[in-house]
Amino acid sequence: MNYSLFISCSKGLEYLLEDELKGLGLHVTQVSPQGVYGEASLPVIYNLCLWSRLANRIQLILFSGHATKEQAVHQLCTDFHWQTVFTHDKTIAIEFHGASEQIRNTMFGAQIVKDGIVDHFRRLNGSRPSVDKEKPQILIHAHLKNDILTVSFDLVGYSLHQRGYRKKAGKAPLKENVAAAMLLRAKWPELAAQGYSLHDPFCGSGTLVIEAAMMAAHIAPGLLRQDQSLQYWARHQSSLWEKLRTQALQQVKPLAVKLIGTDADSKIITLARSNAERAGVLPLVEFNTLSLNACRPGTKRGLVVCNPPYGERLGEVTQLVPLYQELGTTLHTCYQGWQAAILTSSPVLAKALGLRADKQYTLYNGPLECKLYCLTLSAANKLKNTPNAPLSDNAQMLFNRLEKNRNHLQKWARKNQITCYRIYDADLPEYAYAIDIYNDYAVLQEYAPPASIPVHKAEKRSLEMLQVVPRALGIHPEKLIVKQRKQQKGSEQYQKIGKTSQRLIVTEGKAKLIVNLYDYLDTGLFLDHRLMRLKFAQLEPGTRFLNCFCYTASASVHAALAGALTTNVDLSKTYLLWAEDNFRLNDINLSKHQFLQYDCKEWMKTTRDKFDVIFLDPPSFSNSKRMSDILDIQRDHVSLINMAMRLLNPDGVLYFSTNLRQFKLEPMLKEKYAVQDITPQTIDQDFKRNSKIHHCFKIVMPHFADN
């Protein structure tokens, strides 16, 4: 007896799935978007469940019929002989897709189908199946389209990509059947038969390596689980199923090839090993913690297959270009004689590889359209992103400007014991970046391009920027960090954009300071305020210093090293802990300093403490939920300054600073206090090209203005 089936798959795998299913004995009747229709005997059905590496679900089509209204759907489901599929003591769940004029809600549609099944069994023997939406023994699919209802039974009960070996995954997991599709497109079964090795340099939780091992060792993916819904099917033949399982186990063969997965993250490597152990292939594979630039082939020929990170937004894509350039260089330099298959969603990143692809295949990683680039790594496939590749005329102008800035600012920075400074700030308008040096790292902040600039132009400039910066500044591509700077609103300025927690120690005069170049848009150190911080390094010992909106308290570190007693107030616990770490790094005794987590406005209203020097550097705007009110510095600066002046000793000094470019100081403040605009004195050499980076004022009581 033959059964009608629909086997679903991820978008883009339809014809690859068709070939696989034909090889397993399915008589294919139609290929449709995201699936294949066909007919099969019971042994073939069992083999599909055991051996398909590409399928999502295997659905046994039960019946179809015309149905536009609720009553028609119910009648079709009541009339069907459900006892030929399962008995009343089984648990069920319904997945409903589609709609009609009357049935517009999938939950409502599922309810009608369920009621029809229940009514059928009640009419048959007075009993009914129970519903279990979480883990049903019988999963029924109902699809209503063009007034035709099609109902099917999910023979396995879950998507076949859920092999059972992956309990946890990495940050961007690749579905097992998509990984299998990558390997099939790359001709891995044929290459493995010829003795080729395999290496995934971005292995993550090990999916590609594990799937490759299962293919090469002829391990049926359906063997790993024994909780298929088949066992609850009324027509299930357990003896035949066990016979085919045994045959599948007997087909497993020893491996004569080497399969290696590497990743820079040691924790994810531990996870990959655990997954491989659950898959039963741990003795067949090797997982090591290794950075990309340390990867080397262990054999003369093999397949490099990987799913490197790829961003969906322009800023993310740009940041990944150096990684892809390094991947291309590594492949070309070290893996001659090998094949490669690289999956990415970005043509820009594919181009950054610098290598010519023999073939491209469209695959979908979840909803994201990707391309699998298959390459032959040989001397004939010349690398186009070599360090000495010629620059365009515009890129050469950028190179010249960066080289000029570097020659000037490096000497100045060395002389002043500074290891972090701005080297470029959109000097050439067509390359709208700010570039900051932190030791031997470069942070590139891309100003968001106007909507009028086509995406391809913006991407071209980004690629040229990333081509030029390492050459002109002598920075290793791995030490380029790219961010996209845009006008920030409210709490966005302090929100995380990553979670690497990688810290770097930089030097500024006598102070050592902690920066984080990856996790936030800002790094923990505002470079433009350097001269203000160095001013505080000249304070007299015992000076009572208040740093309001202190951020990571880098200004207070300078003051404390001079012997001042500091009070540091900020709403963020994260930054206050960072501030304390800055103090510890400089061997400053924390017991002489205060770190207070408060809304600065509220704290200044209530405190009775007095200070000799106050540094007030609030954000331009903040609407943090933890604040009592929205902060708008143009609107609120008068009240903030008045509150700060109340906390000064009679001969004290307030330094007020803001990065709001269009800031205008309220004239009445000059009538009440002695106010001096000291902005020019606070702009250091590296910010001379952008003198409006901030505004800074020295404010004292009038009778101390001349002191």
From Swiss-Prot:
Its predominant location is cytoplasm
Give the Gene3D superfamilies listed for this entry: 3.30.2130.30, RNA methyltransferase domain (HRMD) like, Vaccinia Virus protein VP39
The catalytic activity of this protein is classed by the Enzyme Commission as 2.1.1.173, 2.1.1.264
**Carries keyword Ribosomal protein?**
no
What's the catalysed reaction? guanosine(2445) in 23S rRNA + S-adenosyl-L-methionine = N(2)-methylguanosine(2445) in 23S rRNA + S-adenosyl-L-homocysteine + H(+); guanosine(2069) in 23S rRNA + S-adenosyl-L-methionine = N(2)-methylguanosine(2069) in 23S rRNA + S-adenosyl-L-homocysteine + H(+)
Q: Where in the cell is it found?
A: Cytoplasm
- Per the UniProt entry, the disulfide pairs are none
- Which Gene Ontology terms cover its molecular function? 23S rRNA (guanine(2445)-N(2))-methyltransferase activity; RNA binding; rRNA (guanine-N7-)-methyltransferase activity
Which keywords are on file for this protein? Cytoplasm, Methyltransferase, RNA-binding, rRNA processing, S-adenosyl-L-methionine, Transferase
List the GO cellular component terms.
Answer: cytoplasm
Stored SUPFAM superfamilies: S-adenosyl-L-methionine-dependent methyltransferases
Instruction: Return the Pfam families for the record.
Output: Methyltrans_SAM, RlmL_1st, THUMP, UPF0020
| THUMP domain sequence ranges | 44-155
UniProt similarity note: Belongs to the methyltransferase superfamily. RlmKL family.
NCBIfam families to which the protein is assigned, alphabetical: PRK11783.1
Biological role: Specifically methylates the guanine in position 2445 (m2G2445) and the guanine in position 2069 (m7G2069) of 23S rRNA.
* Protein's name according to its UniProt entry: Ribosomal RNA large subunit methyltransferase K/L
Upper taxonomic lineage: Bacteria, Pseudomonadati, Pseudomonadota, Gammaproteobacteria, Legionellales
